Structures are given as C-alpha cells and as structure tokens.
Swiss-Prot record:
This is U1-cyrtautoxin-As1b. The presence of a 'disulfide through disulfide knot' structurally defines this protein as a knottin. It holds the Pfam family Cys_Knot_tox. Belongs to the neurotoxin 21 family. It comes from Apomastus schlingeri. Neurotoxin with probable ion channel impairing activity. Is both paralytic and lethal, when injected into lepidopteran larvae. GO terms for cellular component: extracellular region. Signal peptide: none annotated.
C-alpha cells in the first residue's frame, strides 16, 4: 500500500514519456523527477510532483519514489 503522504490520492495525468514508457505514479521507484506523473492540469499550480528520497522501513534504506504534494503544505 502506498502511503498517503506520497500523494496517491491526488488526481494526476498518466502520460507516455518521450522514452515510450508511462510516467510513474506516486510511490513508484524513480531516478529523476521527469519520470513522475504530474498533477492534473487544473491542479498544476497547487501541486508539485517530483522524485523524492524516502526512508523505506521495510528495506532499511533510502529509496527514490515519485511524490505529489500540495505546495502550501509543510510536507512538500
């Protein structure tokens, strides 16, 4: 299950990237922010989408995951 703080509940556009792969949704592993799906256009000013370094308690190490959050939130 994807933690809510990664933005899984925020609507996003699922688009194909220039490399032919689909963008990655919140919680997916990533290597750069350009891989991550962006919030729907109506929310693009309110929300930011990026590849973020997160602690994985299950794996016991840091991993890079796509994240979408409200830019006015202290969690962003």
């Amino acid at each position: 299950e994807i933690p809510q703080n990664l933005g899984s509940g925020i609507p996003h556009d699922r688009i194909k990237l220039p490399n032919g792969q689909w963008c990655k949704t919140p919680g997916d592993l990533c290597s750069s922010s350009s891989e991550c799906c962006k919030a729907k256009h109506s929310n693009s000013v309110t929300y930011a989408s990026f590849c973020s370094r997160e602690w994985s308690g299950q794996q016991g190490l840091f991993i890079n995951q796509c994240r979408t959050c409200n830019v006015e939130s202290s969690m962003c």
